[in-house]
């Protein structure tokens, strides 16, 4: 498999936790000590929540307001809708008030507010602030009632009409663009992309594998969908530096290209626990007492808008089920395939799963019994056969002696005949 890239930087800092963990000796990459510590510590807060939101708060950010205003468009796209509507209304009302004040000042300086004055006014029928405000609204929104209008008496009034028209177009373009960008954000697409509640570790093709399941609830496809994962845990460097959240890549097939998936029906993502895996030295007992978090990410382009979306979730160590597999969800009907999402999060236990680490398994410290290696579908098949035999009256053997002509070693090596699962009614 590919190499593991480790990011050598800290994301969160906690001096108190750092001093406390610096004195601890934890095995399997969780510390510098050599002795194993199986007393579970208090679990840290989840870095990425189940719904994909990052559990992070930024404090003591210098010049935060100025930085957000410098990128005002992104700020408007990211803020909540209620604040977006407030900005939308304020932008128009303030511009109307500003230009209404300008037209009122022009009328005041020209003497148009004096009813006894004779002569041509700069803006006809503008003899109060209310009239100037209404004229500003009519100019910017191009309503044009025809009752008030600018004349050629004052060039400054003509210039302000032109200037307000340009400003109004800029405000319209900015606000409408921000609203459309906010509506087109693929964030809500994540509501129809789901991860399984638990990850599992089980044997697959003779190797221990970490697996989790992803599904797409919509019929529209996710274009160029691909997955990646990272393991977050604290560690202490050889120099004694405490890193509270060290990020380690988990290989899900990036080098071979199998990280790209065709997400039409639910798919199980597989991470082979090999010598490059951060889980290579962890046994079931180590997993049960470990304190780490696996962040899983699904990325792809929304078919309708071609915009990239990212769906995230995470699994803590206590959310990884050792010796379990996922129940099947895809069933073949007569002319189509059916996906049963009621089984999406369900798992079943595989009793013969080795409890040792992948390293111990590779070094053949654990002998896997072939005689007890039943897959879920074969268990179902055997159960159905026993029920049929009991209904047909086939007598069961009561002898406990082993016949002399049967070789138990050869019998254990004979694999079970696979039985494909083709109908939901069979299970």
Swiss-Prot record:
Motif (PDZ-binding): 425-427
Family per record: Belongs to the inward rectifier-type potassium channel (TC 1.A.2.1) family. KCNJ2 subfamily.
Membrane topology: Multi-pass membrane protein
UniProt organism field: Homo sapiens
Regulation: Channel opening is promoted by binding phosphatidylinositol-4,5-bisphosphate (PIP2).
Name under which the protein is recorded: Inward rectifier potassium channel 2
Localization terms from the record: Cell membrane; Cell membrane, Sarcolemma, T-tubule
Stated consequence of mutating residue 71 to V: In LQT7; loss of function mutation acting in a dominant-negative manner
